[in-house]
Amino acid sequence: MDTNALRETLLGKYQLRKTEKQKSAFIDWVKTYADEIGIPVIVEESRIFVRSRNIVFGDVDSARVILTAHYDTCARMLLPNFSTPGNLPLFVLEQTFLTLLIVLGGWLAGWGAGALLRGAVHPIVCGLACLLAGVLGSALVLYLMLVGPANPHTANDNTSGVLLILAAMQRLKGKPGVAFVLFDNEEKGLFGSLAFIKAHGQAARRFLVNFDCVGDGNTLLLTGMKGGMRMPQAKRLMAAMEEIAPEYGMKTVSGVFPKWIYPSDQMLFPRGTAFAALKGKRVLYMDRIHTARDTMLEQRNVECLLDILEKI
Protein backbone atom coordinates (compact mmCIF):
# COMPACT_ATOMS: atom_id res chain seq x y z
CA MET A 1 0.00 0.00 0.00
CA ASP A 2 1.56 3.31 -1.07
CA THR A 3 1.51 6.50 1.00
CA ASN A 4 -1.49 7.97 -0.79
CA ALA A 5 -3.52 4.79 -0.29
CA LEU A 6 -2.58 4.77 3.40
CA ARG A 7 -3.63 8.41 3.68
CA GLU A 8 -7.01 7.79 2.07
CA THR A 9 -7.66 4.72 4.23
CA LEU A 10 -6.78 6.52 7.45
CA LEU A 11 -8.85 9.60 6.66
CA GLY A 12 -11.74 7.60 5.25
CA LYS A 13 -12.06 4.77 7.77
CA TYR A 14 -9.87 5.31 10.84
CA GLN A 15 -9.71 9.06 11.44
CA LEU A 16 -11.48 8.77 14.81
CA ARG A 17 -9.47 6.76 17.34
CA LYS A 18 -10.93 7.89 20.66
CA THR A 19 -13.35 5.28 21.99
CA GLU A 20 -12.29 1.73 22.85
CA LYS A 21 -14.29 0.45 19.88
CA GLN A 22 -12.64 2.91 17.46
CA LYS A 23 -9.19 2.06 18.78
CA SER A 24 -9.84 -1.67 18.50
CA ALA A 25 -10.90 -1.33 14.86
CA PHE A 26 -7.79 0.70 14.10
CA ILE A 27 -5.52 -1.78 15.92
CA ASP A 28 -6.98 -4.71 13.98
CA TRP A 29 -6.33 -2.93 10.67
CA VAL A 30 -2.79 -1.92 11.67
CA LYS A 31 -1.94 -5.49 12.70
CA THR A 32 -3.10 -6.74 9.31
CA TYR A 33 -1.05 -4.04 7.57
CA ALA A 34 2.08 -4.91 9.58
CA ASP A 35 1.66 -8.61 8.76
CA GLU A 36 1.34 -7.79 5.06
CA ILE A 37 4.63 -5.86 4.98
CA GLY A 38 6.43 -8.38 7.19
CA ILE A 39 7.01 -6.39 10.38
CA PRO A 40 6.39 -8.00 13.81
CA VAL A 41 3.71 -6.22 15.81
CA ILE A 42 2.55 -6.54 19.40
CA VAL A 43 -0.09 -4.60 21.34
CA GLU A 44 1.08 -3.81 24.88
CA GLU A 45 -1.76 -3.16 27.30
CA SER A 46 -1.23 -1.33 30.58
CA ARG A 47 -3.05 0.80 33.10
CA ILE A 48 -1.55 3.99 34.51
CA PHE A 49 -4.69 5.88 35.58
CA VAL A 50 -6.31 4.87 32.28
CA ARG A 51 -6.17 1.82 30.03
CA SER A 52 -3.52 2.23 27.33
CA ARG A 53 -2.78 0.04 24.33
CA ASN A 54 0.56 0.87 22.72
CA ILE A 55 1.25 -0.68 19.31
CA VAL A 56 4.90 -1.77 19.01
CA PHE A 57 6.49 -2.72 15.68
CA GLY A 58 9.85 -4.47 15.56
CA ASP A 59 12.30 -5.07 18.41
CA VAL A 60 12.36 -1.88 20.49
CA ASP A 61 14.68 -3.40 23.10
CA SER A 62 17.54 -3.83 20.62
CA ALA A 63 16.77 -0.83 18.40
CA ARG A 64 19.20 2.06 18.04
CA VAL A 65 16.41 4.39 16.84
CA ILE A 66 12.72 4.40 17.78
CA LEU A 67 10.22 6.32 15.64
CA THR A 68 6.93 7.18 17.34
CA ALA A 69 3.59 8.97 17.09
CA HIS A 70 0.46 8.96 19.19
CA TYR A 71 -2.59 7.40 17.58
CA ASP A 72 -5.30 8.43 20.04
CA THR A 73 -7.38 11.42 19.01
CA CYS A 74 -8.55 14.42 20.97
CA ALA A 75 -11.80 15.84 22.26
CA ARG A 76 -13.40 18.63 20.27
CA MET A 77 -12.87 22.19 21.47
CA LEU A 78 -14.75 25.28 20.33
CA LEU A 79 -11.49 27.23 20.19
CA PRO A 80 -8.36 25.91 18.43
CA ASN A 81 -5.37 24.79 20.47
CA PHE A 82 -3.24 27.59 19.02
CA SER A 83 0.44 26.94 19.71
CA THR A 84 3.68 28.89 19.20
CA PRO A 85 6.50 26.47 20.14
CA GLY A 86 9.31 28.97 19.51
CA ASN A 87 7.84 31.97 21.33
CA LEU A 88 7.89 31.48 25.10
CA PRO A 89 5.82 34.57 26.07
CA LEU A 90 3.05 33.63 23.63
CA PHE A 91 3.23 29.99 24.71
CA VAL A 92 2.77 31.01 28.36
CA LEU A 93 -0.11 33.28 27.34
CA GLU A 94 -1.82 30.39 25.52
CA GLN A 95 -1.53 28.11 28.56
CA THR A 96 -2.77 30.91 30.83
CA PHE A 97 -5.80 31.39 28.59
CA LEU A 98 -6.67 27.69 28.80
CA THR A 99 -6.30 27.83 32.59
CA LEU A 100 -8.61 30.86 32.72
CA LEU A 101 -11.24 28.93 30.76
CA ILE A 102 -11.18 26.25 33.44
CA VAL A 103 -11.41 28.87 36.20
CA LEU A 104 -14.22 30.67 34.36
CA GLY A 105 -16.22 27.46 34.18
CA GLY A 106 -15.92 27.09 37.93
CA TRP A 107 -16.81 30.73 38.58
CA LEU A 108 -19.93 30.54 36.42
CA ALA A 109 -21.06 27.33 38.13
CA GLY A 110 -20.50 28.87 41.57
CA TRP A 111 -22.28 32.07 40.59
CA GLY A 112 -25.23 30.09 39.26
CA ALA A 113 -25.50 28.08 42.46
CA GLY A 114 -25.40 31.28 44.51
CA ALA A 115 -28.12 32.90 42.41
CA LEU A 116 -30.39 29.91 42.96
CA LEU A 117 -29.77 29.38 46.68
CA ARG A 118 -29.12 32.86 48.07
CA GLY A 119 -31.88 33.71 50.56
CA ALA A 120 -33.38 30.24 50.33
CA VAL A 121 -30.90 28.45 52.60
CA HIS A 122 -28.53 29.29 55.44
CA PRO A 123 -25.56 31.45 54.25
CA ILE A 124 -23.03 28.79 55.27
CA VAL A 125 -24.90 26.14 53.30
CA CYS A 126 -25.11 28.52 50.35
CA GLY A 127 -21.37 29.21 50.53
CA LEU A 128 -20.49 25.52 50.64
CA ALA A 129 -22.83 24.81 47.74
CA CYS A 130 -21.22 27.60 45.69
CA LEU A 131 -17.76 26.21 46.46
CA LEU A 132 -18.78 22.69 45.48
CA ALA A 133 -20.44 23.92 42.29
CA GLY A 134 -17.32 25.90 41.41
CA VAL A 135 -15.05 22.88 41.83
CA LEU A 136 -17.41 20.70 39.81
CA GLY A 137 -17.71 23.37 37.11
CA SER A 138 -13.94 23.61 36.67
CA ALA A 139 -13.65 19.82 36.70
CA LEU A 140 -16.32 19.58 34.00
CA VAL A 141 -14.48 22.02 31.72
CA LEU A 142 -11.22 20.10 32.21
CA TYR A 143 -13.04 16.82 31.57
CA LEU A 144 -14.52 18.12 28.32
CA MET A 145 -11.07 19.31 27.19
CA LEU A 146 -9.52 15.90 27.80
CA VAL A 147 -12.22 13.28 27.31
CA GLY A 148 -15.21 15.14 25.91
CA PRO A 149 -16.95 14.40 22.59
CA ALA A 150 -14.55 13.33 19.85
CA ASN A 151 -13.21 15.88 17.42
CA PRO A 152 -14.69 14.84 14.04
CA HIS A 153 -11.56 15.73 12.08
CA THR A 154 -8.02 14.75 13.12
CA ALA A 155 -6.05 15.07 9.89
CA ASN A 156 -3.11 16.91 11.42
CA ASP A 157 -3.44 15.89 15.08
CA ASN A 158 -2.39 13.18 14.79
CA THR A 159 -3.43 11.21 11.74
CA SER A 160 -0.45 12.86 10.06
CA GLY A 161 1.95 11.28 12.56
CA VAL A 162 0.26 7.88 12.25
CA LEU A 163 0.53 8.05 8.45
CA LEU A 164 4.21 8.94 8.70
CA ILE A 165 4.95 5.95 10.96
CA LEU A 166 3.03 3.47 8.82
CA ALA A 167 4.66 4.74 5.62
CA ALA A 168 8.11 4.76 7.26
CA MET A 169 7.65 1.11 8.23
CA GLN A 170 7.55 0.26 4.53
CA ARG A 171 10.29 2.66 3.50
CA LEU A 172 12.75 1.73 6.28
CA LYS A 173 11.99 -1.94 6.94
CA GLY A 174 15.35 -2.95 5.46
CA LYS A 175 17.27 -0.54 7.71
CA PRO A 176 18.68 -2.35 10.76
CA GLY A 177 18.09 -1.13 14.29
CA VAL A 178 14.90 0.86 13.64
CA ALA A 179 11.67 0.15 15.55
CA PHE A 180 8.32 1.92 15.64
CA VAL A 181 5.71 2.67 18.29
CA LEU A 182 2.21 4.15 18.15
CA PHE A 183 1.44 5.52 21.62
CA ASP A 184 -2.00 5.58 23.17
CA ASN A 185 -3.43 8.33 25.41
CA GLU A 186 -1.10 11.21 24.62
CA GLU A 187 -4.11 13.51 24.60
CA LYS A 188 -5.11 12.48 28.13
CA GLY A 189 -1.66 13.13 29.59
CA LEU A 190 1.15 11.07 27.98
CA PHE A 191 -0.07 7.92 29.71
CA GLY A 192 0.84 5.63 26.81
CA SER A 193 4.44 6.79 26.68
CA LEU A 194 4.67 6.54 30.48
CA ALA A 195 3.59 2.90 30.19
CA PHE A 196 6.18 2.30 27.47
CA ILE A 197 8.96 3.66 29.69
CA LYS A 198 7.82 1.42 32.53
CA ALA A 199 7.85 -1.64 30.26
CA HIS A 200 11.05 -0.85 28.33
CA GLY A 201 13.42 1.00 30.63
CA GLN A 202 16.54 0.49 28.53
CA ALA A 203 14.81 1.13 25.21
CA ALA A 204 13.47 4.39 26.61
CA ARG A 205 17.05 5.68 26.65
CA ARG A 206 17.52 5.15 22.91
CA PHE A 207 17.39 7.94 20.36
CA LEU A 208 13.70 8.62 19.73
CA VAL A 209 11.96 10.68 17.05
CA ASN A 210 8.32 11.57 17.64
CA PHE A 211 5.95 12.84 14.93
CA ASP A 212 3.06 14.97 16.11
CA CYS A 213 1.11 17.32 13.83
CA VAL A 214 3.37 17.12 10.78
CA GLY A 215 0.65 17.52 8.14
CA ASP A 216 -0.27 21.22 8.09
CA GLY A 217 2.45 23.82 7.63
CA ASN A 218 5.28 24.91 5.37
CA THR A 219 8.08 24.89 7.97
CA LEU A 220 9.48 21.70 9.49
CA LEU A 221 10.54 21.92 13.13
CA LEU A 222 12.97 19.46 14.71
CA THR A 223 13.32 19.97 18.43
CA GLY A 224 13.96 17.94 21.55
CA MET A 225 15.78 17.53 24.81
CA LYS A 226 19.50 18.33 24.92
CA GLY A 227 20.40 14.65 25.18
CA GLY A 228 18.54 13.88 21.98
CA MET A 229 19.60 16.87 19.90
CA ARG A 230 23.26 16.13 20.67
CA MET A 231 23.05 12.62 19.24
CA PRO A 232 24.73 11.87 15.87
CA GLN A 233 21.36 10.73 14.52
CA ALA A 234 19.84 14.14 15.29
CA LYS A 235 22.70 15.90 13.54
CA ARG A 236 22.17 13.71 10.48
CA LEU A 237 18.47 14.51 10.52
CA MET A 238 19.15 18.25 10.72
CA ALA A 239 21.60 18.08 7.83
CA ALA A 240 19.16 16.01 5.76
CA MET A 241 16.31 18.35 6.62
CA GLU A 242 18.23 21.40 5.43
CA GLU A 243 19.17 19.61 2.21
CA ILE A 244 15.86 17.93 1.33
CA ALA A 245 13.14 20.30 2.59
CA PRO A 246 13.85 23.03 -0.03
CA GLU A 247 13.30 20.43 -2.76
CA TYR A 248 9.71 20.20 -1.50
CA GLY A 249 9.33 23.97 -1.16
CA MET A 250 9.58 23.80 2.62
CA LYS A 251 11.61 25.69 5.22
CA THR A 252 13.28 24.32 8.34
CA VAL A 253 13.99 25.34 11.93
CA SER A 254 15.56 23.41 14.79
CA GLY A 255 16.40 24.01 18.41
CA VAL A 256 16.61 22.59 21.91
CA PHE A 257 14.06 22.59 24.75
CA PRO A 258 13.23 24.99 26.42
CA LYS A 259 13.96 27.48 23.63
CA TRP A 260 11.50 25.41 21.62
CA ILE A 261 8.64 24.02 23.70
CA TYR A 262 6.69 21.29 21.96
CA PRO A 263 4.62 19.28 24.45
CA SER A 264 4.26 15.71 23.23
CA ASP A 265 5.45 12.21 24.10
CA GLN A 266 9.14 12.86 23.35
CA MET A 267 9.41 15.12 26.42
CA LEU A 268 9.45 12.04 28.69
CA PHE A 269 12.52 10.54 26.99
CA PRO A 270 16.08 11.72 27.80
CA ARG A 271 17.06 11.35 24.12
CA GLY A 272 13.70 12.31 22.69
CA THR A 273 13.25 14.56 19.67
CA ALA A 274 10.19 15.56 17.66
CA PHE A 275 9.15 16.76 14.24
CA ALA A 276 6.21 19.12 13.71
CA ALA A 277 4.98 21.33 10.88
CA LEU A 278 4.42 25.03 11.52
CA LYS A 279 2.92 28.00 9.70
CA GLY A 280 3.85 31.66 9.63
CA LYS A 281 6.95 33.73 9.00
CA ARG A 282 8.03 35.98 11.88
CA VAL A 283 6.06 33.98 14.44
CA LEU A 284 5.78 30.26 13.73
CA TYR A 285 2.56 28.73 14.90
CA MET A 286 0.17 25.80 14.72
CA ASP A 287 -3.60 26.22 14.53
CA ARG A 288 -6.84 24.36 13.71
CA ILE A 289 -6.01 21.37 15.91
CA HIS A 290 -8.62 20.15 18.41
CA THR A 291 -11.38 21.68 16.25
CA ALA A 292 -13.52 20.53 13.33
CA ARG A 293 -11.22 22.59 11.06
CA ASP A 294 -8.37 20.07 11.48
CA THR A 295 -8.71 18.81 7.91
CA MET A 296 -5.27 19.45 6.37
CA LEU A 297 -2.84 16.59 5.81
CA GLU A 298 -0.34 17.55 3.12
CA GLN A 299 1.12 14.45 1.51
CA ARG A 300 4.08 16.60 0.49
CA ASN A 301 5.04 16.95 4.15
CA VAL A 302 4.97 13.19 4.69
CA GLU A 303 7.01 12.44 1.56
CA CYS A 304 9.58 15.05 2.58
CA LEU A 305 9.93 13.53 6.05
CA LEU A 306 10.25 10.03 4.62
CA ASP A 307 13.16 11.18 2.45
CA ILE A 308 14.76 12.81 5.49
CA LEU A 309 14.37 9.65 7.58
CA GLU A 310 16.32 7.61 5.06
CA LYS A 311 19.42 9.51 6.26
CA ILE A 312 18.96 8.54 9.91
Predicted regions: what is each one?
Residues 64-70:
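Short beta-strand element of the alpha/beta-hydrolase
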Residues 1-20, 38, 62-64, 75-77, ...:
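N-terminal hydrophobic or amphipathic helices/low-complexity stretches enriched
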Residues 1-25, 31, 37, 43, ...:
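N-terminal capping segment at the start of a domain
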Residues 1, 72-80, 274-277:
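Short, solvent-exposed beta-strand-terminating loops
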Residues 217-312:
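Active-site-adjacent substrate-binding region
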Residues 73-76, 188, 215-218, 280-283:
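Short, acidic Gly/Pro/Ser/Thr-rich loop/turn segments
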Residues 114-233, 261, 265-266:
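Acidic/histidine-rich catalytic neighborhood of metal-dependent amide-processing enzymes
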Residues 15-62, 79-121:
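A non-catalytic alpha/beta surface segment that caps or lines the substrate-entry region
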